[in-house]
């Protein structure tokens, strides 16, 4: 067993003290998260075939592991929409058609998953069908399902997580789960029991319009209370170690759970934030930045350590999204279930050939056929829509924190589409969270270049194809909306704004976030105005119109007409907070708008030439 480390502390990471009692049990946790549609291998690595091979190898190393998914198992994407014959082998003469993405998820060897916000994007009926077809069960401790298609899948009590596929509880949703690390007969476990609970974001209905018949806690305290009830139940059932799958949009929000008093949890697997926790010297996605925690944590960033209010150490782990990495955490515990240290070999494993060799992992030929068949099914989407000679930037860590050329191009497309039907629309505003990928090619030496834009590129980058709408509102309401879009600016929020040409948006990194009250998953009222928006200018019929200057709305009652997408107009991502606005539909969608723009070389050049739209100030 590893030697317990010395107590450490920094200004941001409080002291963590491990038990010095003898270690009597080891938890081997294998985890992924935010895989969305990332089932196909790319030039650098990744893909479901490699992922399944690595997970299998890690399970064999461990002897008895717990394999979990931290949410967002899918997202609206071509890989989900197309169908291929499966199983693709000669032993099945008449294979059924199946979504390759769902087949991929069932091939990973998961014991359990938590539903993420994107799992709801296509509605509860679709998610219910996905869960029914899953080879593993789901856990959602803070999700109250009051009706709708998911209600029939709810398992009121705890479920056991077994190695059989499909699992006995496959296709069910439970508030908590247990896994026996020894031999089990019925509910009797000869060994340590690991409990699994799960949290969804309090903002679930802001993040996904498909969540209609579910309720979530209104705030962090409510989430802590819901989790505590399941922790207490697990402890009463003889559980020794508790793992929390948290899809609350990133590890900093999970720190907040501990600060709010969550106790009894030993490990938190963070999802929804795609925190790239990669220690120095370990391989990761080429060209991608590691999480800042990896340079600030005294005990390293895999895992990150925090202390609960009862003094117990809590390990937090996460992986980047898109099925590029599999995490493997091994922790030792004393007889009281308190962590004594991290076992050697705990690390994130980047899914490349070097990892396969190091782990002696064997890739399943059937999963290689799955990837090949998926590529064949996607081939008709290689229709070229237009030529763009520069890389269009849609990487999450960039587009959610700053202006990017792809964000600007999509906003300009919305404006063009809206103005065809409503000529007096002056600007377009959109969120960054709906931009899911870049468009371009990465050369072997890491350069990012432009390429012909295909239909597949479009469907991969803009996966939701929301309707284009026109919103009429006051200058004060627009300023409040941009304040809502700037909440958490700099921390990778999907609500972060991208704007059309002619807009000048200056925001303060040090400004105060807007505070709101939620009701039934939507912003009911603004409790405290934000102070991030410094300046906002939009085009006008006779020249630029200054809406906000120095943080002050100059003409609050004046009216303006803007283009956006229906998801935001309906209050998604917290936009248009507590407002009743005039929404005028158009016949266009995001895809149609983008296709029209990218087919016009002059319009593309003009759009890409206009930069400096969104400016960060101190």
Describe the residue ranges of each PLM region:
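Catalytic centers of hydrolytic enzymes
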Residues: 15-28, 32, 36-40, 44-48, ...
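Acidic, metal/ion-coordinating pockets
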Residues: 2-350, 409-416, 428, 472, ...
